[in-house]
Amino acid sequence: MDIAHDLQSIGAQEQALVFPQFDPARAWALGNRMHALATARGHAIAIDIATFGQPLFFAALAGATPDNADWVRRKRNVVAHFRRSSYAIGLRMQQAGATLADKHGLPISEYSPHGGSFPLTVAGAGVIGSITASGLPQRADHEFVVEALCAELGHDYAVLALERS
């Protein structure tokens, strides 16, 4: 895995995966799409869609644990703080040889810079929340969210997917 290349690709994902508008009905549709995709693949994950301060969709699939819900919360906090994908922030920390606690004073009990939370961006408004998955390895959590967003927004996932490592 080439961190610099992944960071460039994640930046392209974040630029492309923008909603023209977003409301609770759209959150419900996206959440159900993610639930169906995860169920079909047998993923034991938690899925969360929220605007900052308001939960819109949450599901814990068979096999997911309360720990997954806590990972969701901590990854979501990273997106809220940085307005970037939690995976991008984690890769940047890895690249710098630092932690969020070292570099930003953010406790690991509240912030997890691991893949799986993606900015919920609306054209003309910017980042208004996050779409998060937890239960797979971090790169797979990230890509699961990106794949679902591509399907929801009509983008070709093959074009935006991270290179296989």
UniProtKB/Swiss-Prot annotation:
SUPFAM superfamilies: GlcG-like (SSF143744). Pfam families: HbpS-like (PF03928). Transmembrane segments: none annotated. Coiled coil: none annotated. Belongs to the UPF0303 family. This is UPF0303 protein Bcep1808_1522.
